[in-house]
From Swiss-Prot:
Keyword Transferase: yes
Gene: trmA
GO term, biological process aspect, one: tRNA methylation
An MF annotation (GO) of this entry: rRNA binding
A UniProt-annotated Pfam family: tRNA_U5-meth_tr
HAMAP family: RNA_methyltr_TrmA
Binding site for S-adenosyl-L-methionine: Q187, Y215, N220, E236, D296
Protein name: tRNA/tmRNA (uracil-C(5))-methyltransferase
Organism field: Pseudomonas fluorescens
Amino acid sequence: MVQRMTFDAASYTAQLQDKVTRLRDLLAPFDAPEPQVFDSPLQNFRLRAEFRLWREGGERHYAMFSQDDKRTPILIEEFPIASLRINQLMPQLKAAWQASAALSHKLFQVEFLTTLAGDAMITLCYHRPLDEHWHTAANKLAADLNVSIIGRSKGKRDVIGRDYVVEKLDVGGRTFSYRQPEGAFTQPNGTVNQKMLNWAFEALGDRSDDLLELYCGNGNFTLPLATRVRKVLATEISKTSVNAALSNLDENAVDNVTLVRLSAEELTEALNEVRPFRRLHGIDLKSYEFGSVFVDPPRAGMDPDTCELTRRFENILYISCNPETLAANIAQLHDTHRITQCAMFDQFPWTHHMESGVLLTRR
């Protein structure tokens, strides 16, 4: 059965307060200040969406599955939490595949990626090779919808247009342009992401020393934070993200960043002079005067050695997608650093997930 997605907007404030209370309780043992709270739009905040396709009543529908029931599809006609652009594209794409066997044959998954700047890309995933009939239909679809189209089939990828979207975000009075590649991680809530960037920009402040950044991704935070310091050494392990970050640095004429493809654990070994790394050839780590470190780790948080590494710095600016691992990392650092600023970002409304940020300063 086709199901309309519903939610009670009036309950948003209560849900938001529950998250703030949870963060406050987790950080209470560390005498954290009251968190600044950055809310989200109630609808149309999510810039990307992924749907399986499900056949019912002789046609394919967008479908999702509950965490509690992976077998029973929830058929989707509209998706209010997704961006307006995604909601505009959903029926247009559905009409296109219904009218074209070349587009619909063995199509099993659709992914949308959009930006606040209005760019859009659609990825179509198939259980078959893509032939010239598909290319003809997909080229027309891309032109009709003014989007880029990615066709994926058994490890192969066909690109019509670009394999990335362009986002523009305003931070500290400047507009930064970001290339966001298909398949790479990007923050899903663009409005809240912009709030996070501005909070981090203000928390770091203007400094005359250098910044170490771990887990830099496509340069989401790197670009604005680089304007606050003398030099940045940034690390990222994903090759796709590294390439996007390099393009973004060039596009925005940010020339004081050195980017190396190392994991946080490997950089820890390099700084501790445990062993040399060929990927650091020509980079003099001793030339940096690090005063601050910025970390935005995965849900598991920082491993103990990386956490210990951050203790060396006067300031630790930490963005977290998991408040429990954030609290565990702070517990390791609490004897030398105290929380001077704290924030909660409602990146994921209508879920229990949240982003949080802290600035830790050496005692």
